[in-house]
Swiss-Prot record:
Dimer. Residues 1-18 are virion surface. Residues 41-100 are intravirion. The gene is NB. Changing residue 20 to A: Loss of gating and proton permeability. It is a single-pass type III membrane protein. Glycans are attached at residues 3, 7. This is Glycoprotein NB. InterPro entries: InfluenzaB_glycoprotein_NB. The lineage of its organism: Viruses, Riboviria, Orthornavirae, Negarnaviricota, Polyploviricotina. Putative viral proton channel. May play a role in virus entry. GO terms for molecular function: channel activity. Belongs to the influenza viruses type B glycoprotein NB family.
Amino acid sequence: MNNATFNCTNINPITHIRGSIIITICVSLIVILIVFGCIAKIFINKNNCTNNVIRVHKRIKCPDCEPFCNKRDDISTPRAGVDIPSFILPGLNLSEGTPN
């Protein structure tokens, strides 16, 4: 008296494949949007940092700005290392230019 049998022979394989393809496309689009969002966030943060450096460089008009800004106003590449302000070591010339 078991009337709750399930017959697997009537499943249409084309419908099953179509559903799998739709799910795969949706998941792929979500992953692509997440990756592009992360990349855009990185570039937005980089631009904010660059704008802050430009503002600080324009605000500080003095010869001792070398630790904070590059001489050539080249802010496209970040500087590595730790900047030491010139007032801490006044007798040491740390500039990247030619010697006097």
